[in-house]
Amino acid sequence: MKWKEQAVILGTRQYGETSIILEVMTRQHGRYMGIVKGGHSRRMAGLLQPGNFVEAEWWARLDEHLGLFRLEALDLYAARLILLPEALYALQLIVFHLRLLPERDPYPSLYDILHLFMQNFDESFVNAELLVRFEMRLLEELGFGLDLSRCAATGRQERLFYVSPKSGRAVCEEAGRPWKEKLLTLPQFLVRRAIRPVNFSDIINGFILTGFFLMRHVWEPRGIKQPSVRVNLIQLFERRFRM
């Protein structure tokens, strides 16, 4: 068995005295692991950092085997990532979420957002928006996607300002006004893609929205608390956006 594809490095762990087990995310093969022989060497250390973009070649005698990786560097983002705390936290959060998904199952839309994030990690607003979109897509991939296409009460497709915490469906301004204290705010960049720039309150409301449904459907059923890296990241965004 053999494949070759571009990949983002997610993490490593030691394997024996000189090798490592590498974890990557690819578009066509999903989250994949394999052995990198000699990966524990100083020469390989810079290449194998989380966030780096590589050409990964994997092969094994049988598909169910762990297999071996051969890598070629494409974009070594990691050296710049460590200079930006919010970008580093963001990558750690993405990796946390990707590990909730089955290994070796393709999730091309999540990979595309991850790749776009890596290309824009030094732009805070783009970075934050992509993270909200990533969490929205994660909910969808796990079977808990929100329906933001029309108002749950009236069927209208305009002025969708809220989301019902019970149904996960959008609610328009008119229908939601009497109940707005009990509804979640719907960030407009999730329903009106042309909005630029995305504003601070929309970003925070986006994290509140995705966090509510991730807690209900993903974290609590698995006995997981909201990851501390997510809390720290949102606090960093708040400080940066208010400067």
UniProtKB/Swiss-Prot annotation:
Gene3D superfamilies reported in the protein's UniProt record: Nucleic acid-binding proteins, Recombination protein O, C-terminal domain
A single GO BP: double-strand break repair
Keywords: DNA damage, DNA recombination, DNA repair
A Pfam family assignment: RecO_C
SUPFAM superfamilies: ArfGap/RecO-like zinc finger, Nucleic acid-binding proteins
One term under GO cellular component: bacterial nucleoid
Purpose of the protein: Involved in DNA repair and RecF pathway recombination.
Family of this protein: Belongs to the RecO family.
Protein name: DNA repair protein RecO
Organism: Bartonella quintana (strain Toulouse)
Lineage: Bacteria, Pseudomonadati, Pseudomonadota, Alphaproteobacteria, Hyphomicrobiales
